[in-house]
């Protein structure tokens, strides 16, 4: 759970008042600048957000009649308000300090400019409050594409990752991948701290990839864009041989491209994954070989049908 105390420690902010409220949870990544509230309009006050007071808000506050000031500040300090932050190192109004002390609302001062602090806060909160999950698999950076390799236990995921590392690609996580959703369409994968940089090879044991292959062979985290699912070759199953069938894998409501690769002796899975990653990059650049082939095939069929009619 993210608390105001962790926010203060991580961003190195200065607490002025409301120390007893540091244990308040932060549940909303949005940030509010209470301009209308300063004017007395609290009907739609987003009190569960962090409140940011900059030069504009405080200069307007100084124009308020003395009789209204204390009341406005008390209304800002709701029980669910995680923090009120004054930017640019400005001096908080005395009425705000008193209200924060009395109502246990953390009052914080930051030296950053308002827009700069808002950017820092947004980045921090989006990461800290992102939805998370974990998946059994291996995450590798192949030609800049985050490839999540999945499949049944013993199918050869770790061995394939080792071959990819030897070919110059970078390991992110083996066996267990911790995934968090930053945006609606952005998934970031990283390893648990316990097994960071480690790779388990059956018959060999656990190896430290960074020690063996150097710092350039590992990454601490990577955006997941492509899923390669390995499965034992099934003669009864029809596998995609053209590339027109688009499969997807849903993780935390985010869809990523999925390719199912049948595994059998003699197939170089690492090379296939390299080609899949390069082909994915071509696809997002607007080049789809499967569609081009399909169009050429259709044109040839139409041409031949016209010849037969003649």
Curated annotation (Swiss-Prot):
Cofactor: Mg(2+)
EC number: 2.7.11.-, 2.7.4.-
UniProt xrefs under SUPFAM superfamilies: HprK N-terminal domain-like (SSF75138), PEP carboxykinase-like (SSF53795)
Any GO BP: regulation of carbohydrate metabolic process
Active site, renumbered: 136, 157, 175 (proton acceptor), 241
Assigned GO CC terms: cytosol
Binding sites annotated in the UniProt record for Mg(2+): 158, 200
Further comment found in the protein's record: Both phosphorylation and phosphorolysis are carried out by the same active site and suggest a common mechanism for both reactions.
Function: Catalyzes the ATP- as well as the pyrophosphate-dependent phosphorylation of a specific serine residue in HPr, a phosphocarrier protein of the phosphoenolpyruvate-dependent sugar phosphotransferase system (PTS). HprK/P also catalyzes the pyrophosphate-producing, inorganic phosphate-dependent dephosphorylation (phosphorolysis) of seryl-phosphorylated HPr (P-Ser-HPr).
Quaternary state and interactors: Homohexamer.
Family of the protein in this entry: Belongs to the HPrK/P family.
Name listed for the protein in its UniProt record: HPr kinase/phosphorylase
Organism this protein belongs to: Staphylococcus aureus (strain NCTC 8325 / PS 47)
């Amino acid at each position: 759970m993210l608390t105001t105390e962790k926010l203060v420690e991580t961003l190195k902010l200065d607490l002025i008042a409301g120390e007893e409220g540091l244990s308040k949870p932060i549940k909303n990544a949005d940030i509010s600048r209470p301009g209308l509230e300063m004017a007395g309009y609290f009907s739609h006050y987003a009190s569960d957000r962090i409140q940011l007071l900059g030069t504009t808000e405080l200069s307007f506050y100084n124009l308020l009649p003395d009789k209204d000031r204390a009341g406005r500040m008390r209304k800002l300090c709701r029980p669910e308000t995680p923090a009120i932050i004054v930017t640019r190192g400005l001096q908080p109004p005395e009425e705000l300090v008193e209200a924060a002390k009395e109502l246990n609302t953390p009052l914080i001062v930051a030296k950053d400019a308002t827009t700069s602090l808002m950017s820092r806060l947004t980045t921090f909160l989006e990461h800290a409050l992102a939805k998370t999950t974990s998946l059994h698999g291996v995450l590798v950076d192949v030609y800049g594409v985050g490839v999540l390799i999945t499949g049944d236990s013993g199918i050869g995921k770790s061995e394939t990752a080792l071959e990819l590392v030897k070919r110059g690609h970078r390991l992110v996580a083996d066996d267990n991948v911790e995934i968090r959703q930053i945006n609606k369409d952005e998934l970031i994968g990283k390893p648990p701290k316990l097994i960071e940089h480690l790779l388990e090879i059956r018959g060999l044991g656990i190896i430290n990839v960074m020690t063996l292959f150097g710092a350039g062979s590992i990454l601490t985290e990577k955006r997941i864009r492509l899923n390669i699912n390995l499965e034992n070759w099934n003669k009864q199953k029809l596998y995609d041989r053209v590339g027109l069938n688009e499969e997807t894998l849903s993780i935390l409501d985010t869809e990523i491209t999925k390719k199912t690769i049948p595994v059998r002796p003699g197939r170089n899975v690492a090379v296939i994954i390299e080609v899949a990653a390069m082909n994915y990059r071509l696809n997002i650049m607007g080049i789809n070989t499967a569609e081009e082939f399909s169009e050429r095939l259709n044109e040839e069929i139409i041409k031949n049908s016209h010849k037969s009619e003649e």
